[in-house]
Design a protein with these regions (language model features):
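Flexible glycine-/small-residue-rich
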Residues: 26, 46-48, 55, 114-118
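Compact, glycine-rich, soluble single-domain proteins
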Residues: 48, 56-93
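Hydrophobic residues embedded in beta-strands of well-ordered beta-sheets
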Residues: 51-52, 110
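Enriched for short, Lys/Arg-rich terminal
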Residues: 119-137, 141-144
């Protein structure tokens, strides 16, 4: 089960990514296994040499009534100290943002792909959409070239 933040690629330039662990409660893990998680509005902050993710929505687990946590509580991310220092330098010096890109299982553990991102302006978004559309048209033309039989060739056979 992979939960992806699709808006992140549209709204940000992704400079670098880090795979990190995340501290969760038991009912939150069960909700994530069921696919009841949303990364769209979430972001990361650095506080006292630790990294936290805010606003990550994990819906409450149905079968656990009293043990459910708040849906958008602050969750701690697990990284090496060297990685945290490098991320902190990048965020402070370059003015970058920490954005969760993907939540997935690696074995029996849940991992979060954390991206160090720079925000896109509206003209950047339009340019990337144009580039994507052009690439799609090129692929369509190549596909048609290999799989479409020219009409003149068909007339020659009959």
């Amino acid at each position: 089960m992979e939960i992806e933040n699709r808006q992140a690629k549209h709204n940000y330039f992704i400079e670098d990514t880090y795979e990190c662990g995340i501290v969760l409660k038991g009912t939150e893990i069960k909700s994530i296994r069921a696919g009841k998680c949303n990364l769209r509005d979430s972001y990361g902050i650095i506080k006292a040499n630790e990294i936290f993710v805010l606003n990550m929505f994990i819906s409450p687990y149905k079968e656990a009534s009293i043990y459910n946590e708040s849906e958008t509580r602050t969750r701690k991310l697990l990284l090496h100290k060297k990685e945290i220092k490098k991320i902190a330098q990048d965020v402070e010096q370059k003015g970058l943002t920490l954005i969760p890109l993907k939540l997935y299982f690696k074995g029996d553990k849940i991992k979060l792909l954390l991206g160090i991102c720079r925000g896109k302006k509206n003209y950047d978004k339009r340019e990337s959409l144009k580039r994507k559309d052009e690439q799609r048209q090129i692929e369509k033309a190549i596909k048609c070239k290999y799989y479409c039989v020219p009409v003149m060739f068909l007339y020659c056979l009959f």
